[in-house]
Amino acid sequence: MKLIILDHYSQASEWAAKYIRNRIIQFNPGPDKYFTLGLPTGSTPLGCYKKLIEYYKNGDLSFKYVKTFNMDEYVGLPRDHPESYHSFMWNNFFKHIDIHPENTHILDGNAADLQAECDAFEEKIKAAGGIELFVGGIGPDGHIAFNEPGSSLVSRTRVKTLAMDTILANARFFDGDLAKVPTMALTVGVGTVMDAREVMILITGAHKAFALYKAIEEGVNHMWTVSAFQQHPRTVFVCDEDATLELKVKTVKYFKGLMLVHNKLVDPLYSIKEKEIEKSQSSKKPYSD
């Protein structure tokens, strides 16, 4: 497990974006080899998405051969509703990059058979070869996706009833009107995310400090579903200083002492421009008479 501690939200967002960029470029995706990326919604990943868009616009990164799978979607909310996760992803990320729409996968909360939709989503992940890197965020109660406290740590994609704390937290997106807030959602399971070859979890802000403490300093507990990722062989937690307020001083000191090593994951920062130059140079035949 790696814990990356940056000073501020913007730095944490940039580190995460650099990591995703390097992972995609090092994977060297192509027509017969897609990079599969799991993605979250919410305010936490917005800074990361903005940096990824910047990398694309600068010509340093392409999503042409990337397939994405989103974590969740509300049940009963029209796809074009401004607060649907379809709208969120298209407005904040997908429409700004070169990803093909057919390569984006978001659960359909209006499907006639919701469980069949969840089962099909799992099959699509398998057909894509599994998730290479699953990026996630958490709530103050430690839930990941909509795996609320008490969720099974081996759960799969399913229909989930939302906890009242989540409904109250989401009311701000629905004019503060609890009656407008969806009470159910489709969500990947903890087990679904655990199946990814690598997991990166973004945790920022003092309001999530206790959840981070539960995630890494205490034992695995289904009341704090994010704690399950202690047992994943390749978990990266990316956080800002505020999120570390509940951690022991020695824990923070230990992981900060590893930053010189961990920063090598994003430095050097790779670019598809460099890859294209290397490719063109290697394809040139030596001069001969």
Swiss-Prot record:
Protein EC: 3.5.99.6
Cross-referenced SUPFAM superfamilies: NagB/RpiA/CoA transferase-like
Organism: Bos taurus (Bovine)
Gene name of the record: GNPDA1
Entry keyword annotation includes Ribosomal protein: no
Entry keyword set: Acetylation, Carbohydrate metabolism, Cytoplasm, Hydrolase, Isomerase, Phosphoprotein
Organism placement in taxonomy: Eukaryota, Metazoa, Chordata, Craniata, Vertebrata
UniProt xrefs under Pfam families: Glucosamine_iso
Database matches in NCBIfam families: nagB
Subunit and interaction comment: Homohexamer.
A single MF term (Gene Ontology): isomerase activity
Record PTM N6-acetyllysine, positions in chain: K64
Protein name: Glucosamine-6-phosphate deaminase 1
Active-site residue numbers: D72, D141, H143, E148
Family membership noted in the UniProt record: Belongs to the glucosamine/galactosamine-6-phosphate isomerase family.
Function as written in the Swiss-Prot or TrEMBL entry: Catalyzes the reversible conversion of alpha-D-glucosamine 6-phosphate (GlcN-6P) into beta-D-fructose 6-phosphate (Fru-6P) and ammonium ion, a regulatory reaction step in de novo uridine diphosphate-N-acetyl-alpha-D-glucosamine (UDP-GlcNAc) biosynthesis via hexosamine pathway. Deamination is coupled to aldo-keto isomerization mediating the metabolic flux from UDP-GlcNAc toward Fru-6P. At high ammonium level can drive amination and isomerization of Fru-6P toward hexosamines and UDP-GlcNAc synthesis.
